[in-house]
Amino acid sequence: MSAPLIELCDIRKAYGGIDSPKVEVLRGISLSIHPGEFVAIVGASGSGKSTLMNILGCLDRPTSGSYRFAGRDVAELDSDELAWLRREAFGFVFQGYHLIPSGSAQENVEMPAIYAGTPPAERHARALALLDRLGLASRTGNRPHQLSGGQQQRVSIARALMNGGHIILADEPTGALDSHSGAEVMALLDELASQGHVIILITHDREVAARAQRIIEIRDGQMVSDSAASQPSPAQPEQLQANDLRQRLDRGAILKGAWKGEMIEALQAAWRVMWINRFRTALTLLGIIIGVASVVVMLAVGEGSKRQVMAQMAAFGSNILYLNGKRATAQEPGGIVTLDDVAAIGELPQVLHVMPVIGGQLMVRQGNSSQKFYVGGNNTWFPAIFNWPVVEGTFFSEADEASGAAVAVIGQKVRSKMFGEGSNPLGQYLLIGNVPFQVVGILAAKGASSGSEDSDERIVVPYSAASIRLFGSHDPEYVAIAAIDSRRVNETEAAIDRLLRQRHQGKHDFDLTNDAALIQAEARTQNSLSLMLGAIAAISLLVGGIGVMNIMLMTVRERTREIGIRMATGARQRDILRQFLTEAVMLSMVGGVTGIVIALLVGGGLLLADIAVAFALPAILGAFACAVITGVVFGFMPARKAARLDPVKALTSE
């Protein structure tokens, strides 16, 4: 006689206790099952036979007692080893079929092999062969709702045999079938028993139980009879699989599975679920899409604005310093920078050019047109200092400056507003204040220098003419200074500071700034603005993440039975965790990609509306990464909840 494959000794199972009444379902069950046996466990509803099957199939653990499988104490096995047993040793056939609704017949049959790490080609071939053997060759692509009850039960039998099905646990396999389909299922079980499979049949129907070699009766959680027949000979080749199980258990051969195959299956299953629930998926995606699109667009607008302002400021030169007298306060009088100071600064070796500036808003007239423009008195270094060339005509000369000539160089918008678009104003006159000035040149378009000031609405006249004819003051409003080396602006600033302190009897009655510092300050301001815009947009991404978590929690609740089915077919906790985490991440990835596409389209529209937009690859990748991380973070809790479900409770959930 062969050694028992399954040994139960004084198995007890109780529920409740402490805060609720204790209910003992199994009371001291002891039995042995040998390789090749066909055993029927018979009992009325509530007798404990299904609980016994769950313990035999490693779906549940007994409260007390000993369960040895192939010589190993099952109590010593961890959750992964129990999953291995369910995957490699057992095959379940349930009364309610327990097929995954979103999968085809073939996909349902292949499930145990996926968790076993079987290569796809081998897996597909075996599933098709099993379905063909069970008369379902033409139904491989059908989903459960497209199959009859008998066909669904045959699919579940094929699934039980996918990894070998050494031990078939059939719980009321004919209970939901008509007599013809029930007879077909029992004939299949008879055939499997004759091939050496251990068949454990759970039923309340004694006529069905009579097909077994051995009948065990359970009543009120106790075994009341056992009509054990003679044990099958262990010499039969079909029974050698039991020895193989013992050897693999002894070696600790716990199959890890092929992570690539499992990941592909997880992705495919996730896509199926998303496609089946398209409307709900779209609503969930909306939060992620809006979040990602908002982040990308906001950062692009901020970056575009920053680049535009920086370009405009840099266009005036980064080697320029500005000098002006300090404003008077209640504590001390104001300072004045004189033309003599300007001349002294021009002698410094660090200074390339120096230019006094006097100016203000004045009424300008030409014909019937009149408007206020900024009029600045400058010297001939204006184009060089501000990198601002004349595109038509000429700039005024040193002779004009020396004589105080009433000549003017105008900006592009002064030209269009006072003379009309496309006109030639050269040689014509503008009445500035009450003084006529002849237009001798037109400056290149420059745009806004900072804020809302438009540099093209500017008129440049000789400093001498402005100070005498227009403003009545010889002292400059401020002084523009160009350093020889833009990399040594700070050194130039220090030299000017020392010179002026000496000239002003040690007083620091002047302010000296440089464009490089202004550009850096503006860059910091723009960066802060971009971060603020991104943070505001990120809130919508957070809301989208909460939506993902909400929908995943709902999904876990809806698919609790599916989780139980996967566990019964050998899925480990990490497999379930991976499955639902993959769904959450895929949801976020699809939302992220869609959000980026929409953001690019919105950005294109903003560009057409002449709004500065600059998409930065790091910002796009960062937004996508945030979407994925959102899926991981907000999908982890629902996935962990799914992985921690009790297999028995999951299978019996509605």
Curated annotation (Swiss-Prot):
Top EC group: translocase
Subcellular compartments: Cell inner membrane
Nucleotidyltransferase among keywords: no
Transmembrane stretches, start-end: 282-302, 529-549, 596-616, 617-637
InterPro entries: AAA+_ATPase, ABC3_permease_C, ABC_transporter-like_ATP-bd, ABC_transporter-like_CS, MacB-like_ATP-bd, MacB_PCD, Macrolide_Exporter_MacB, P-loop_NTPase
GO CC terms: plasma membrane
Domain ABC transporter: 6-245
Top-rank taxon, per record: Bacteria
Keywords associated with the record: ATP-binding, Cell inner membrane, Cell membrane, Membrane, Nucleotide-binding, Translocase, Transmembrane, Transmembrane helix, Transport
Residues bound to ATP: 43-50
Keyword Flavoprotein: no
CDD domains linked: ABC_MJ0796_LolCDE_FtsE (cd03255)
Protein EC: 7.6.2.-
Gene Ontology molecular-function annotations: ATP binding; ATP hydrolysis activity; transmembrane transporter activity
Membrane topology category: Multi-pass membrane protein
Coarse class of the protein's main subcellular location: membrane
Protein function: Part of the tripartite efflux system PvdRT-OpmQ required for the secretion into the extracellular milieu of the siderophore pyoverdine (PVD), which is involved in iron acquisition. This subunit binds PVD and drives its secretion by hydrolyzing ATP. The system is responsible for export of newly synthesized PVD after the final steps of biosynthesis have taken place in the periplasm.
Complex and partners: Part of the tripartite efflux system PvdRT-OpmQ, which is composed of an inner membrane component with both ATPase and permease domains, PvdT, a periplasmic membrane fusion protein, PvdR, and an outer membrane component, OpmQ.
Family statement drawn from the similarity comment of this UniProt entry: Belongs to the ABC transporter superfamily. Macrolide exporter (TC 3.A.1.122) family.
Name assigned to this protein: Pyoverdine export ATP-binding/permease protein PvdT
Species this chain originates from: Pseudomonas entomophila (strain L48)
